[in-house]
Amino acid sequence: MLTLNYYVEISATPQRVWEVLTDVELYKRWAQAFSPQSQFEGAWEEGGGITFFDPDMGGTRAIIDTVLPLQKLEFHHVAIFNPDNRQQLDADLASRWIGSREIYQIDTNNDRLLLNVTIHTHNDFVSMFNHGWAKALPLIKAISEEQA
């Protein structure tokens, strides 16, 4: 697995950035950087499951490892599925995807807030993450700063 790092400085409170990351409707606004109808179902609770999907494209299921409100979210992917909601646990693509990990860290220092995103993934997904996060981080920043 490779480690990818992305970050953006945001002029907003940790509460606002946390809300942008975890609220269903706000998530849809920035996650469109990855797919047009990207959304999630589930609760941000340690040990719980969450599903990220686009109804037209399928998605992924993840288990939440860490929830430190206003500070850190961490989860790892355990399955991918087709638009018809059938899991692909044995497919070649699934074997490369399962185990991928995402970590979202909100760091504050004086008046600075930095959102750090760390991804551990297979080489096949580097381009997807690079392109997606290049679009998603400015959206997260803009949405967070709307009501800062």
Label the predicted regions.
Residues 38-41, 57-110:
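Hydrophobic-ligand binding "helix-grip"
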Residues 22-25, 138:
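Solvent-exposed alpha-helix faces
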Residues 1, 49, 70-72, 110-114:
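A generic structural signal for beta-strand entry/edge sites
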Residues 3-10:
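Short amphipathic
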Residues 95-98, 120-148:
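A conserved amphipathic terminal alpha-helix motif
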Residues 5, 25-61:
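Short beta-edge strand/loop motif at the mouth of beta-sheet-based domains
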Residues 49-55, 75-77, 117-119:
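Short beta-strand segments that buttress and anchor functional surface loops
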